[in-house]
Amino acid sequence: MATTNKVYFIAGGNRGIGLSLVKELSSREGTTVFASARKPEAATELQEWSKSHPNVKTVELDVTSQQSANEAAQSVAKAVDGIDVLWLNSGICQSYYTVMEAPEEVWNAHYQTNVLGPIHVFKAFYPLLTKKKTRQVIFTSSECGSMGDFRATGFSAYGQSKAAINFTMKELSVELADEHFTFISIHPGVVKTDMNADAIKKFTETSPEMLTYLKKVTIIPEESVSSMLKVVDNLKPENNGSFYRYDGTIIPF
């Protein structure tokens, strides 16, 4: 179906930062927003929002499965002729261990969701992106994945997964440069979400210094999203391959 709207797909649009993105983008004129959830029927707040915003469509997606990603893309292709912006926001942060302490299953879970997940989704949605001229792909990343601004945080598997996805973003920015894509990674800040609440709870027990830091820098999802959208709304081809903080400053890889 042809549409003149600007079309967004938010992977992981059912809670936290992703849900705030859905709400902000769907409140704009001339937008269509697809929001994914692993179990859409359980995403009650997203479902309620979509009832009052007919430009929001929910899509079932398990990012750890290439088949699920392919099926999600096929579902979207039945509704629109292409997408402008793919925002790869799905992720987990359940690694509050040192490298020596982290169990193998924790490393595997973070790699499957935070690294292979975005790759699965991008590969599935690549044909839909090529149908539009915008061709913007946004990876929600983290400063924890920066080598150039490295800080020992105790987020071992999480930090490693974000470093890996930053590499993937950079590699894609070169591989598909001739196709006029714009890829970026963006750190949303330390955001007050259920995921970060778990981190605060953990550091209450293990690291008072980290707890103090997290409480000092934590922002609400709406602040993070409004700031990130200022970056994304103003992207230019020369920004391809960049790693940003939510406020638009550059993070070294």
Curated annotation (Swiss-Prot):
Protein species of origin: Schizosaccharomyces pombe (strain 972 / ATCC 24843)
Membrane-crossing residue ranges in chain numbering: none
Protein name: Uncharacterized oxidoreductase C663.09c
GO terms, biological process: cellular detoxification of aldehyde
Signal peptide: none
Organism lineage string: Eukaryota, Fungi, Dikarya, Ascomycota, Taphrinomycotina
Keywords (A to Z) from UniProt: Cytoplasm, NADP, Nucleus, Oxidoreductase
Keyword Transferase set for record: no
Binding residue positions for NADP(+): I17, S36, D62, N89, K123, Y158, K162, V191, T193
